[in-house]
A protein has these predicted regions:
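Short edge beta-strands and adjacent turn/loop segments
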Residues: 13-29
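Residue-level signature for short turns and capping positions that connect secondary-structure elements
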Residues: 26, 35-37, 72
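N-proximal, solvent-exposed amphipathic alpha-helical segments enriched in charged/polar residues
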Residues: 1-16
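Histidine-centered active-site/metal-ligand motif
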Residues: 27, 46, 63
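A short interface-forming secondary-structure element
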Residues: 32-46
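C-terminal structural segments of small proteins and small subunits
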Residues: 51-81
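Short, non-transmembrane amphipathic alpha-helical segments
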Residues: 6, 10, 45-60
Length: 81
């Protein structure tokens, strides 16, 4: 799997205002900004992202995904710091 493929999968299941994915083909790091994270705690946000991946995690197609999840307001604050 490539970073572009993983981005496409996440975007297909989650409305993202910003998304970056980097990695080596098995271990991935993503920064995801979505209004769908509003009012949700970290674990709920991660579950939303994992839901977009479906069985790709279980089948080891995506071995590991580290992520930072932000609402648009949180992202704007992070950029202004």
């Amino acid at each position: 799997m490539t970073a572009d493929q993983l981005q496409s999968i996440i975007r297909a299941g989650l409305a993202c205002e910003h998304l970056t994915v980097e990695g080596d083909g098995r271990h991935w790091y993503a920064t995801i900004v979505s209004a769908e994270f509003e009012g949700k705690r970290l674990l709920a946000r991660q579950r939303l992202v994992y839901a977009t991946l479906g069985d790709r995690i279980k089948t080891d197609e995506v071995h590991a995904l580290s992520m930072k999840t932000h609402t648009p307001a949180e992202w704007a604050n992070a950029l202004s710091e």
